[in-house]
Amino acid sequence: MTSVVVVGTQWGDEGKGKITDFLSADAEVIARYQGGDNAGHTIVIDGKKFKLHLIPSGIFFPEKVSVIGNGMVVNPKSLVEELDYLHQEGVATDNLRISDRAHIILPYHIKLDQLQEASKGDNKIGTTNKGIGPAYMDKAARVGIRIADLLDKDIFAERLKANLAEKNRLFEKMYESSPVAFDTIFDEYYAYGQKIKDYVTDTSVILNKALDKGRRVLFEGAQGVMLDIDQGTYPFVTSSNPVAGGVTIGSGVGPSKINKVVGVCKAYTSRVGDGPFPTELFDQTGERIREVGHEYGTTTGRPRRVGWFDSVVMRHSRRVSGITNLSLNCIDVLSGLDIVKICVAYDLDGKRIDHYPASLEQLKRCKPIYEELPGWSEDITGVRSLEDLPENARNYVRRVSELVGVRISTFSVGPDRDQTNILESVWGL
């Protein structure tokens, strides 16, 4: 039995899709365990980009099983659109399995998301307006609708009516907005359910059987540790648990069956939306990194905030997710800089701290303490081994590993699959 979890260690957009796609080559089952279509991942195959939001990266391997786990919140409309997109691109989806326990996102969740965000004014949290938070709210409040319910016409109608009665009171009384009509949702979304029903099953059974048979299972996280609702920069977080521990809840697989955790990070840092970002750059260096790194959100299209690599963030992620291996991406983006910086600690009111504070007020006062390293000018996009990197780039990679306290198992020098270099196989192959 071998299982590997892939988690983002920063604020998402670290290149998890690419690394998952890369590791999928040796996996037999690939599963997502949290989030929804608020997270996008881009996979490049033979120079062609595929952008997915719900379906696991393993879908491009027809001989492997791809799983949408129970911890996800699924917009049936988005899922059907994504399936249609893959079919149009000639990608088969017969290997997809969808948990009957996953909750669904409906139009009233999206409307509530938008109204709540607009009402916050300057205190907005930067939601993607995809209805993710309200769907997880319904799940926690025990009024959510699951995929199993969506497939039963009578149950779906009953629960939809009950939810709309509550939501429409909220829309009309609190937000002074128009109600959502039952007829605008029911037929359309029941039809979506019928389109996906052949994929729906108890995915916990599939995953545990695979592990018990010694098959290699890869768990694919969305967002990143710093967006985790418990361990991230609350309240500027997502509504689920991207940390590795979220696997057990979101997939129905026990913690004793998890072997390795691969933390994915960039050689710098990026963030979409509001919230603390101690190493953020506002100068020409930041603009250069944004443009060279094409730092625009897959889901929102918004320019990402960028900054230097933050080892304080990374050590926090290592600790709360139990990271055993590191995958360092986008080293090539830093090529051409005379000096590259790594944040090694924070200065908080004149005191050096090595941990990431929970208090937003303290974070506002934190100043990064940097270590400067000499940069490199060479084009490294064709490098295929650590030894072939320029000395300064090689030293940068080693210093990142030292500061985080985790060995690097892969590093990448570009977006393509063949630009990912293995230092150590996490599968033990």
Swiss-Prot record:
Keyword hit for Ligase: yes
Binding site residues for substrate: 298-304
Catalytic activity: IMP + L-aspartate + GTP = N(6)-(1,2-dicarboxyethyl)-AMP + GDP + phosphate + 2 H(+)
GO biological process entries: 'de novo' AMP biosynthetic process; IMP metabolic process
Positions with a binding annotation for GTP: 12-18, 40-42, 304, 330-332, 412-414
InterPro entries, alphabetized: Adenylosuccin_syn_GTP-bd, Adenylosuccin_syn_Lys_AS, Adenylosuccinate_synth_dom1, Adenylosuccinate_synth_dom2, Adenylosuccinate_synth_dom3, Adenylosuccinate_synthetase, P-loop_NTPase
Any Pfam family the entry gives: Adenylsucc_synt
Domain of life: Bacteria
PROSITE patterns noted in UniProt: ADENYLOSUCCIN_SYN_1, ADENYLOSUCCIN_SYN_2
Residues at which Mg(2+) binds: 13, 40
Protein name as annotated: Adenylosuccinate synthetase
EC number of the protein: 6.3.4.4
Cofactor note: Binds 1 Mg(2+) ion per subunit.
Cell compartment(s), UniProt: Cytoplasm
UniProt pathway: Purine metabolism; AMP biosynthesis via de novo pathway; AMP from IMP: step 1/2
Alphabetical keyword list: Cytoplasm, GTP-binding, Ligase, Magnesium, Metal-binding, Nucleotide-binding, Purine biosynthesis
Residues bound to IMP: 13-16, 38-41, 128, 142, 223, 238, 302
Organism: Streptococcus mutans serotype c (strain ATCC 700610 / UA159)
GO molecular function: adenylosuccinate synthase activity; GTP binding; magnesium ion binding
Top-level EC class: ligase
Main location, first listed in the record: cytoplasm
One of the record's GO cellular component terms: cytoplasm
Catalytic machinery residues: 13 (proton acceptor), 41 (proton donor)
Cofactor dependence: Mg(2+)
